[in-house]
Amino acid sequence: MPTKKNNFEEQLNELEKIVTNLENGNVPLEDALKEFQEGVKISRDLDKKLTNAEQTVAKLIDSDGTEHNLDPNNASAPEE
């Protein structure tokens, strides 16, 4: 089970293991439900981490310290 201390890659690997187990279909129904629930939790946590990383990367800081957010629909042009 992943903990909050696990990094993105560790959680992604755990999610991939869960998906593989469920795809194989050799998991009893009760265990499959538990694994599915854990997979959903991990997926949501990974989504939050990706969103936070995206927001961090989307900020540009000019040489004078002024921050500009990138338009997510047009990553090449900062918003004014």
From Swiss-Prot:
Under the heading Pfam families, the entry gives:
Exonuc_VII_S (PF02609)
Q: Select a single GO molecular function from the record's annotations and give it.
A: exodeoxyribonuclease VII activity
UniProt GO cellular component terms: cytosol; exodeoxyribonuclease VII complex
Enumerate the SUPFAM superfamilies for this protein.
Answer: XseB-like
Comp. bias (Basic and acidic residues): 61-70
What this protein is reported to do is described as: Bidirectionally degrades single-stranded DNA into large acid-insoluble oligonucleotides, which are then degraded further into small acid-soluble oligonucleotides.
Q: What family is it from?
A: Belongs to the XseB family.
Database matches in NCBIfam families: PRK00977.1-2, PRK00977.1-4, xseB
Show the HAMAP family listed in the entry.
Exonuc_7_S
The protein's assembly and partners:
Heterooligomer composed of large and small subunits.
Please give the name of this protein. Answer: Exodeoxyribonuclease 7 small subunit
Originating gene: xseB
